[in-house]
Curated annotation (Swiss-Prot):
Keywords: Hydrolase, Metal-binding, Pyrimidine biosynthesis, Zinc. Binds 2 Zn(2+) ions per subunit. The keyword DNA-binding does not apply. One of its GO terms (molecular function) is allantoinase activity. Zn(2+) 2 binds at D152, H179, H232. Belongs to the metallo-dependent hydrolases superfamily. DHOase family. Class I DHOase subfamily. It comes from Bacillus caldolyticus. This is Dihydroorotase. Its EC number is 3.5.2.3.
Length: 427
């Protein structure tokens, strides 16, 4: 016996939004009915005309465990994911210790099985301790369950080291995922090297420090035959480099964050460290280029770069506070309200950028509503308006620049493998 989600709205295979009933059985989608009456003896959940989408996928989150449990844990971070409609997240390796050896990856996998509320794909580090000095054992880490390889949080500074990493990853049919930043060009900055930095007398991070790493890496990826993925792209120059690389047939993909689509450095209200992230909020021209790049396919999908910190850390001020903001619980409402409701994106585009597009880029089975697919599903209320309130977050991190923003498009139910893991209003 299964359970039916009744009276929802979802996209069919032709991209048409239709009245939908979905049957969940044994952890998978057993049946889908479009524009038909439902006659069922099984249990029924009436979703009242709300949107039904594949569980959202976020391939860039920081769960902080081990070593950063004051900021977040696998349990709290994945509960935040479920609350945001995400059923699959990929956990970055800048933890203490990093998953840079087989034993640490095995420990992490066990911890995920014990405490995670949603599917977690663990990244492994490219270099030991993410120090950029010695490559990890890629084959052993893949065997232990690594999803892909990244030193996210820092850029791999040596071209030779990155090239060798790409060759090893290619031999294992694994991806290299890169935080792109040339340390010799960052200027010790806390914000973008633009008008905001000049106004407040702050050291700025120039755009070129990102683009130059991407330009280097796409050529290395071409030579190595490696799938190369660019994290949190933020500048118009970076978009241009990725666009040119794709035209040249290089296997490169890229993601963009909600905050880089929504904000630029002009929007920072004084020295508020909740607007400090890396890469920083760039210029209005950069933001416009990111939107254009997403629409024309240069940028493949959206990822949050969920980066929780404690209130005490963020209270240190914009120069001393750590980089990063949270994003799992607010991504869909923000993007729906400010891009779909305003006609910049279609609803289908937004859903695809948060589901099937990341799945296709990394060969995941998730990200689609189809018979036989995993029953990873989110139900979203497109009508109710609510203000973002960090005090209600499931995440330990409350560090968001979007407090008080009124949004529609709030998830109300999240299913992972057919199990209801979060429902609005239920403890």
């Amino acid at each position: 016996m299964g359970v039916w989600l009744k009276n929802g709205m979802s996209f069919n295979k032709d991209g048409e939004l239709m009245r939908t009933h979905i049957k969940i059985e044994h952890g998978t989608i057993a049946a889908i009915l479009y524009e038909q009456p439902l006659e069922a003896n099984e249990d029924v959940i009436d979703v009242g005309g709300r949107l039904i989408v594949p569980g959202l996928i976020d391939l860039h989150v920081h769960l902080r465990e081990p070593g950063g449990e004051a900021k977040e844990t696998i349990e709290t971070g994945t509960l935040a994911a479920a609350k945001g409609g995400f059923t699959t997240v990929a956990a970055m390796p800048n933890t203490n210790p990093a998953p840079d050896r087989k034993e640490q990856m095995e420990w992490l996998q066990a911890r995920i099985r014990e405490t995670a509320r949603v599917n977690v794909l663990p990244y492994a580090a490219i270099t030991i301790g993410q120090k950029g000095e010695e490559l990890t054992d890629f084959a052993a880490l893949k065997e232990a369950g690594a999803f892909a390889f990244t030193d996210d949080g820092v850029g791999v500074q040596s071209a030779g080291m990155m090239f060798e990493a790409m060759k090893q990853a290619a031999a294992l049919d694994m991806a290299i995922v890169a935080h792109c930043e040339d340390d010799t060009l960052t200027n010790g900055g806390a914000v973008h090297d633009g008008e905001f930095a000049r106004r407040y007398g702050l050291r700025g991070i120039p755009s070129v420090c990102e683009a130059v790493h991407i330009a280097r890496d796409v050529l290395l990826a071409e030579a190595a035959g490696c799938h190369y993925h660019v994290c949190h792209i933020s500048t118009k120059e970076s978009v241009r480099v990725v666009r040119d690389a794709k035209r040249a047939g290089i296997r490169v993909t890229a993601e963009v964050t909600p905050h880089h689509l929504l904000l630029c450095d002009e929007d920072i209200p004084g020295l508020d460290a909740n607007y400090k992230m890396n890469p920083p909020l760039r210029s209005r021209e950069d933001r416009d280029a990111l939107i254009e790049g997403l629409l024309d396919g240069t940028i493949d999908f959206i990822a949050t770069d969920h980066a929780p910190h404690t209130a005490a850390e963020k209270a240190k001020g914009i120069e001393a506070a750590p980089f990063g903001i949270v994003g799992l619980e607010t991504a869909f409402p923000l993007l729906y309200t400010h891009f779909v409701k305003t006609g910049v994106f279609t609803l289908k585009q937004l859903v695809d950028w948060l589901t099937i597009k990341p799945a296709q880029c990394f060969g995941l089975k998730a990200g689609r509503l189809a018979v036989g697919a995993p029953a990873d599903i989110a139900v979203i209320d497109l009508e109710t308006e609510e203000a973002i309130d960090p005090e209600t977050f499931a995440s330990k991190g409350k560090n968001t620049p979007f407090a008080g923003w009124v949004c529609q498009g709030w998830p109300v139910m999240t299913f992972v493998g057919g199990t209801l893991v979060w429902e609005k209003g239920r403890a």
